[in-house]
Structures are given as C-alpha cells and as structure tokens.
Amino acid sequence: MRLVYGLGRSGLGVLRFLRKRGLPARFYDDRPREEEVREALALGFQPDWNLEEAYEEVVAAPGVPLDHPHLKRLAARGAKVLGEAELAYRLSPTPIVGITGTAGKTSTTLFTAHLLRAHGLRAREGGNVDPPLVSVVDEAEVAVAELSSFQLERVHAFRPRVAVLLNLGVDHLDRHGTVEAYHAAKLNLLKNLTPEDALVYNRLDPKVRRAAEASPARLYPFTPGSTPRETNLRAALEATRAYLDLLGRPLDPGAVAEALRTLPEAPHRFQAFARKGGVVFIDDSIATRTEAVRAALEAAPAPIAWILGGEDKGADLAPLLPLLGRVRVALALGRDGPRFARALEGRTEVVVIAEKDGRTAMRKAVEEALSRLEQGSVLLAPLAASFDQFRDYKDRAQAFREAVFALGGEPWTPSSS
C-alpha cells in the first residue's frame, strides 16, 4: 500500500495518476484544505489521519523535508520515501528530459518543450513548473521535467534519457544544511545515466563540468550567453539536439527559427500584471535568491513597496542594501518576516505583517503598500520559500494577484499601455 503524503497540486496529481492505473493508496496532509480533501475523496481514496497503517511506499510532496518526524517514523517502519518524479518514471514508459540547476530551470524547461514541439513531437513540460510531472507523462510523447533539489533528493531509480545540468550555486541551505548536501541532491539527476543517455551541461561551471566528465552519458556541453535568457536558450537547444539525436533525427534550423519567434515566458518571473492609478503590480514570486531579488529591485519602477518574507533559505541581504533607496516601504510577512525586518530597519520603512494566514497576510501587505504609494510599483520578490504560509510559490503568487484585484487593481501589462 502507498501513502500520498501532502495534497496540493503534487499530491492530487499523484492520486489522479494512481487512480488511472487502478492502484490503491491512502492520503495524509498536516494542513489539509477542505476542497483538496473533497477532491481526494471523490477520486476514491481515503485518508489515514493517524498514520497508523504500514506502507511499502510513501510518495511525499516536495515541500515535506526528508527529516520530517512523520517521514522518519514511516521510513523506520519499512516505507520507502520517494517523490512524484520517481513514481512517474517507474509507472510510465514516457521518456523524460530532466532539467535542474540553481538558476534558469523554469525557462530552460519551457524553451526545451517548445523547441521539441516545433520539431513535431508531442512534448509536455511539468514537474516543478506546472503541472506536476505525473500529470503530463501519460499525455506526452516526451516529458520535459523541471526538477528541484527537493524533488531530486527523493529519487532512487529515476533515469532521464536527457539530463540537463545548468549550474550549481548556493540555495536552500535552510533545507539541505550545507552547500555540499544541496549539490548532492542536484547531482542525483545524473546518478543513473548510462552510455545510452545524454547529458547537457554548462562547460564554464567547474563543479558542473567535473560531474559531467565523470558521467558515462554522451556529453553535450553548452557555453553560457551574455544574459540569463540567452544561456537558457542555448541549454534548451542542446537538450533538443540531444533528444533528437536519440531518435536519429537532426535539429531542423527552420523549425528552430520559427520556434524562436514564439518563445514562452516563465510565469511569476517579474510579471507586471495589474495597475491601479500610477501604481504597477509586479509578480516575481519565483525570486527567492539574492541575485534574482537584486535584479527585480533594480528593474521595478520606483518608489517600490517591496513584499518579502516566508521561510528564509539563508539569504544574504548585503547586496540588496544599496538598492533600498528605491524602496519606499518593505512589507515583511511569513515565518521569518521579523528577521528580515530587523535586517532592513533604519535603511527604509519596514512593516511587519503579523497575520499567520497567508492570504490574509498578503492582502494586508497590499493594503499597506497602496496606503503609501501614488505611483511606482508594488513588487512581490520574497527572497524566501513559501511553504510556511502557502503550498508553493505559485500559490503565493495567486494570493498576491487575488489581493491586488480585490483591492481595485485592474489587469494590465506593459504591452497594453
């Protein structure tokens, strides 16, 4: 018997995937939402709120750390803990292009799927980017999976036909503890590759290059470009070339040229989506690293009402301090909001949003922002993980958008002005 630990988009996706196959399971969530429990019950699954049964496998949502007491107790009773990527690989024959790295995963995943579709393949993206991988493998000829360290730390036999390793930086130290443990989780993408598989890698990242050169897979190096977008596109082109090589097909320059005209944009990545008077609202919910937040603070129209906070991942605020002259107010929410507030005090106005419920806190933050701005921008660039108050960064972005529209924001993009 399997236990699906954690509902949300990943857990419900797993339950749908299992139902298609007629496979039994129970479910558990330590913060259950009524509508998600209803859906799980409607799919024909029952909860195990006391975690009393013995399970062979536990499919844990990526937001649940492996050292969670429940997972440790279930593992001690003989359960193997895995994630949706492992489950998708085991139960579906669809080949997978797996993409990871500290930065650029989402765009590279979207670009790769787009380029493969331009070559006539039924390619679908999933994983860390919507939808879950288990939701696309049954519909796809090839699945392109964005894989986070949280997902890769719980793979066992998982073997993509093409692996893409973009870079190895510093992130998620709150979860993994050390840079070495974080990198080890990322490198799980490579651990089951064979000479029949392909590995696309960044030739200028020394740690990436060393890992690639130790792999038995066929190597496809790429050189980073002058911008993140160019770098991600180069990686996607090599990933497309590598997968086509497995099929015995060449890269089609005409198909590539056509695809480049319609490249997709990553959601929740510095998206201006609404306006109220002279104030623009920018969703950069995916900006959890210092480098990404710095770029957002540089680009957002000043004065800025900056919404940040959540679960601190060990962020370094020092590079952001010179930009606080552009910030009218910092609105710090979530578990570690007070810690961020203390670090910013005396450099700009800081308001701690104490509400515990994520959506209530987000609405309060937007209200506080609008009370201080007549022009400029309200920027959600959290510099922190979302799991303290939200399902994931997408849920956090949705809460921001709901608050903006509830408080009088009107849909708007730069191209509509």
Curated annotation (Swiss-Prot):
Q: What is its main location?
A: cytoplasm
One term of GO molecular function: UDP-N-acetylmuramoylalanine-D-glutamate ligase activity
Recorded superkingdom: Bacteria
Q: Does the keyword ATP-binding apply?
A: yes
Spell out the InterPro entries in the cross-references: Mur-like_cat_sf, Mur_ligase_C, Mur_ligase_C_dom_sf, Mur_ligase_cen, MurD
Q: Which family does it belong to?
A: Belongs to the MurCDEF family.
Name of the protein this chain belongs to:
UDP-N-acetylmuramoylalanine--D-glutamate ligase
Organism in which the protein naturally occurs: Thermus thermophilus (strain ATCC 27634 / DSM 579 / HB8)
